[in-house]
């Protein structure tokens, strides 16, 4: 009786597993928010894997932060350089904008497209020059950046050869090679791995000569190896640890061998390591039979498989980073999210770096100061300094959003201190500080004993303004805004002024300082700027700032306004600052008028018009924009005042504080009022003469 033919054993491959480092998702989130927006074009990425280095744990293909394109201007990146532990593998990422789009992806078509790329590389010979293309992979994903959760699915396209590859023999490499051969093969492998030129080349040839000397060569050198060996093996870095199965990369490797060289019997070498050195006890050597079905050509594209299983099921994986992230870092990402989303569609030209780096000084931490601070935070501004001398009163928390009942207990917390604490509680990443300080005011004379303290406050205020980029004038009285207005004009700092009446409000931005404007103009397009500066808060006054606090009734001492005014005015003040920061001319930007400007086509002002003044009334639910030029007689920002301050310094400030008429005399307002009074008297005389003539007639 004839013996029964032993059935062929089909070669089984251990699937390749994926691993995604958290850094990859963080980097991808930044790329999505900052650059991609709604663009869902495929992204070239790089995965990394290496030979198995543990007898019980397989190696994974890993995505790291460096897996994404390094060139921010291009989403098609060349394969990153690897090292002995990170062999680079090209891949493609398909990220969808909605979970519905993710679920509707044609996964079979995507897999086939990537498999076709591998086959084209095999046919063109590229796979011989760069074998890393053989384990090419793809990833589909959906990133919910609001919740910091990610859904993803890997595929490792692998060809299904028909008929299947038959396994003839498989054994540990230490049993296949003689002791002399094993020693030489180990040394050759270690040299290959130690060389910077070959350490990350995962496919190679192992040639053993008749005198037991081993050498390792590139795949493209196969013809040079013909007849020069006793044993020739096709080696590859095997990520699998199993003793009876080779790893997934061998599948496409065998397809390459069959297609390029028409070999029917192949010896393969599954290279594995232990502690960074070749381990022939873990490594495998096998013999496989590769045959073509009748009528099939070696150039026919085989079918492909490769979607990774998740716990044995064909479903995607998901990960949430919210729980693992530092709460402050998570808050920073969440706060930045809405701003970055603005750039996707609504405002692509928005410069977020300018906003995040600006330093704001808030003079006044009352009703307006609280509203301004909250709105600044919404725009991503992190550096805020409060200056205030008052304490939190029982009446404050309901109108001033940064304070609560506990801040009022005892004698009350200083507002500048309580405001800082509140901002930190709202958003821990805020860089904020509070300064408890009174602002010296003209019309409020001081004694000689107080001079040192007042001048110290003046110096400190000047230093604060110099160290900040924008200053908000939000104090309760008009005269308390004079010194900050002067110092801002002197330092050429952005000054935003907001003031409230009972049912009306005024928000304005000050123009550039008088002595700095001429210097800045040399670097600006003259056609885009006004030849005259924009005015400040005091430019329309014909009197110097005076004491507005003495001899006042209770309703005049307190800020009595309709509660809705402060949120409106505070928001407008911040929007005005953001407009200035986004404008190419900054503080020198001209004042726009809402009735004359075209808000739909303004390249210089991406946020819309940039007015000089905004005045509104809630009693009439109306709002208008006004334009006012700087006055040569202004008591705060005129060149006369700034020059006098620079020349006299402290003595000038003391004289302005102690002598109410000094500023009027200095700027010529005294003479102007005298001329106006004389003009009125002349008219009265003329009217009297005319009456006399009429009577005579």
UniProtKB/Swiss-Prot annotation:
This is Ubiquitin-like modifier-activating enzyme atg7. One of its GO terms (molecular function) is Atg8 activating enzyme activity. Residues 656-697 are annotated as: Homodimerization. One of its GO terms (biological process) is defense response to fungus. The lineage of its organism: Eukaryota, Viridiplantae, Streptophyta, Embryophyta, Tracheophyta. It comes from Arabidopsis thaliana (Mouse-ear cress). Keywords: Autophagy, Protein transport, Stress response, Transport, Ubl conjugation pathway. The C-terminal residues are required for homodimerization, as well as the interactions with ATG3, ATG8 and ATG12. Homodimer. Interacts with ATG8 through a thioester bond between Cys-558 and the C-terminal glycine of ATG8 and with ATG12 through a thioester bond between Cys-558 and the C-terminal glycine of ATG12. Also interacts with ATG3.
């Amino acid at each position: 009786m004839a013996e029964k033919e032993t059935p062929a054993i089909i070669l089984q491959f251990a699937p390749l597993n994926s691993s995604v480092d958290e850094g990859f998702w963080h980097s991808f989130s930044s790329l999505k928010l900052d650059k991609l927006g709604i663009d869902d074009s495929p992204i070239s990425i790089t995965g990394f894997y290496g030979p198995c280095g543990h007898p019980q744990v397989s190696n994974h293909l890993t995505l790291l932060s460096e897996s994404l394109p390094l060139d921010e201007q291009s989403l098609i990146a060349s394969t990153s350089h690897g090292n002995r532990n990170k062999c680079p593998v090209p891949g493609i990422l398909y990220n969808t904008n909605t979970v519905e789009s993710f679920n509707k992806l044609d996964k079979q078509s995507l897999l086939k497209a990537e498999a076709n790329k591998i086959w084209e590389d095999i046919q063109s010979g590229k796979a011989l020059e760069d074998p890393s293309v053989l384990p090419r992979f793809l990833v589909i994903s959906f990133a919910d950046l609001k919740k910091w959760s990610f859904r993803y699915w890997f595929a490792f396209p692998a060809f299904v050869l028909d008929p299947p590859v038959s396994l003839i023999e498989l054994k540990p490499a230490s049993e296949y090679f003689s002791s002399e051969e094993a020693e030489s093969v180990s040394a050759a492998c270690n040299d290959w791995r130690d060389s910077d030129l070959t350490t990350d080349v995962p496919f190679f040839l192992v040639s053993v000569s008749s005198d037991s000397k081993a050498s390792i060569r590139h795949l493209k050198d196969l013809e040079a190896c013909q007849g020069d060996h006793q044993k020739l093996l096709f080696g590859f870095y095997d990520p699998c640890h199993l003793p009876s199965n080779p790893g997934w990369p061998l599948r496409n490797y065998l397809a390459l061998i069959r297609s390029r060289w028409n070999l029917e019997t192949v010896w393969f070498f599954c290279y594995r390591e232990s502690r960074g050195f070749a381990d022939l006890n873990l490594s495998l050597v096998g013999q496989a039979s590769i045959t073509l079905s009748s009528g099939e050509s070696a150039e026919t594209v085989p079918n492909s498989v490769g979607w990774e299983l998740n716990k044995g099921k064909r479903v995607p994986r998901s990960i949430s980073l919210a729980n693992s992230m530092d709460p402050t870092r998570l808050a920073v990402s969440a706060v930045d999210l809405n701003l970055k989303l603005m750039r996707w569609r609504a405002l692509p030209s928005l410069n977020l770096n300018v906003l995040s780096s600006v330093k704001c000084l808030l003079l006044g931490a009352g009703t307006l100061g609280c509203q301004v601070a909250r709105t600044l935070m919404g725009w991503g501004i992190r550096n805020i300094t409060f200056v205030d001398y008052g304490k939190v009163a029982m009446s404050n928390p309901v109108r001033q959003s940064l304070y609560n009942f506990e801040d009022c207990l005892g004698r009350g917390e200083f507002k500048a201190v309580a405001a800082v604490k509140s901002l930190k509680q709202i958003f821990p990443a805020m860089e904020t500080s509070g300064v408890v300080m009174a602002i010296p005011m003209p019309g409020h004379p001081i004694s000689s004993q107080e001079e040192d303290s007042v001048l110290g406050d003046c110096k400190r205020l000047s230093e604060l303004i110099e160290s900040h980029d924008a200053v908000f004038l939000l104090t309760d009285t008009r005269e308390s805004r004079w010194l900050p207005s002067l110092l801002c004009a002197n330092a050429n700092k952005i000054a935003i002024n907001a003031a409230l009446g009972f049912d009306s409000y005024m928000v304005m931005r000050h123009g550039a300082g008088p002595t700095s404007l001429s210097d800045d103009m040399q670097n600006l397009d003259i056609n885009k700027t006004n030849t005259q500066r924009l005015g400040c808060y005091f430019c329309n006054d014909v009197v110097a700032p005076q004491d507005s606090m003495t001899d006042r009734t209770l309703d005049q001492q307190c800020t009595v306004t309709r509660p809705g005014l402060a949120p409106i005015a505070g928001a407008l003040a911040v929007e005005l600052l953001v407009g200035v920061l986004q404008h190419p001319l900054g503080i020198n930007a001209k004042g726009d008028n809402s009735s004359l400007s075209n808000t739909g086509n303004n390249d210089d002002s991406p946020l819309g018009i940039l007015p000089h003044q905004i005045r509104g009334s809630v009693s009439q639910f109306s709002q208008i924009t006004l334009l006012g030029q700087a006055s040569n007689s202004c008591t705060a920002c005129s060149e006369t005042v700034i020059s006098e301050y620079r020349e006299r310094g402290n003595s000038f400030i003391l004289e302005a504080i102690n002598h109410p008429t000094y500023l009027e005399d200095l700027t010529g307002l005294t003479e102007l009022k005298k001329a106006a009074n004389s003009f009125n008297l002349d008219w009265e005389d003329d009217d009297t003469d005319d009456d006399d003539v009429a009577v005579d007639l």
